[in-house]
Amino acid sequence: MKYLVIAEKPSVARSISKVIGAYKHEDGYLEGGDCVVSWCLGHLAEYAAPEYYDERYKSWRFDDLPILPEEWKLLVSEDKKAHFNILRKLLRSKDFDYVVNACDAGREGEAIFRRVYGLAGSKLPVKRLWISSMEDTAIQQGFDSLKDGTEYDNLFAASECRAKADWLIGMNGTRAFTKKYGRRQTIGRVQTPTLAMLTERQNKIQNFVKEPYYKVEITGNGIVAESERMVQEQNADTVQAACDGQCAVVGSIERKWKEQSAPKLYDLTTLQREANRYYGFTASQTLKIVQELYEEKLVTYPRTDSQYITEDMQQTMTDLLNHYSGEVGKVEQVVNNKKVTDHHAILPTLESCKRELNNLSGDKEKIFALIVWKMQQAVQPPYIYEDVLVTVCCQDRKFTAKYKNILQAGHTAMPVPFAEQEKSKDVAFPKKLEQGAVIPVVSAEKKQGFTSPPKAFTEDTLLSAMETAGNKEFEKDTEKKGLGTPATRAAILEKLVSFGYV
């Protein structure tokens, strides 16, 4: 049986061709044996602008809104028409028994193929290649277990729903606000609420009025303790004068044992956040780099929203850990079949174990090292520590000192690769300090501070805010989806910058 394969981009098509034996280069496709492999160029077909539905929409008028297409039109951009014609000819050919959708295994990949397939008027039966790695073995296994294309009808429906909602809100909202305010205002389903979060935070910062407060700090026998905040400076002066040069007593010592589990593996958003935090990479930079690593067969599918692996991947991860660290740790900590969605968490591939990685560029090396580090960190023991709160009494006034004892470093013992390590501000509890201990003489000093405004968003914190937006309004985890998807949040942030909104 002869079959046609359509990938999302040329580089992926070449990787697939090597596995299934399509080596002969033709115009717009590769051929060999019983298969032909071609590719899309990203979104070849997209929904038409309003003027393609009616000439009158070329002029923006408030009275024409809302624009609600009765029948949606897909258009191929001029620069992609030549390649679309090649795909249409292949999809209409009677030489093939079926076509394999080998676009990215996700919602947008499904839409990219289905739109081209529909516009071409193809009647070929569709099979689906669904893989989480570009390794040769993964591609071969995927072709050995192709799915029926109809199993992904709901995924395509979800993509169409998203695309049409974006069109309706974007086209109508942009025209409405532009006409209302007399200058171009772009509106987007995800873009606008994200901008609203930024605006709300910026307003809080700009309108914040800092207010002074005062504390009194007493020092003696190596102990530094401080009072509560005081609004009135004269109150602080009174406390300082009363305690300076006096004796103090350790009133109580409260210990709280705490445990912090190892972090989960990377999904795309968490990787983008930490790459921004440690290296200053933008979300778009990180997505571009990890996508290239994926296409080079060094990491698994990057556009995932899962931070776990499935049970059948335990041995693979064990092999990876043996190679990269020699210590396996507790792999079961990251195994959860129920929390793996379309794809498991981002991992290095087994192929990466065989490759010479010294040739990776600086940025690629950092992202790859970060993924390996997170895999190693995720199987480490918990970080266990003890918070100690010491109350010191002086002249009938209470002061507190805070200490932290690290009982087990666990996953925190692994330094972030290629990043300057933060110096800990924690102070260990003095071993000889006991309840009732007398401090013969303390010095007291008044300290002034100021209340702080909310911090401006970084890409790290904004991505987190987008991911968790609306969570308080929903009880079920299935309803907590936030703003955007791991694959689209970077583009939204880029849009806000390019439009001059931030």
Regions found by a protein language model. Give the residues of each.
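Long, highly charged, low-complexity internal segments
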Residues: 36, 45-77, 89, 185-291, ...
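Short, intrinsically disordered, charge-balanced linker/junction segments flanking boundaries
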Residues: 216, 500-502
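Extended, well-ordered alpha-helical scaffold/bundle regions in very large, multi-domain proteins
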Residues: 281-341, 502
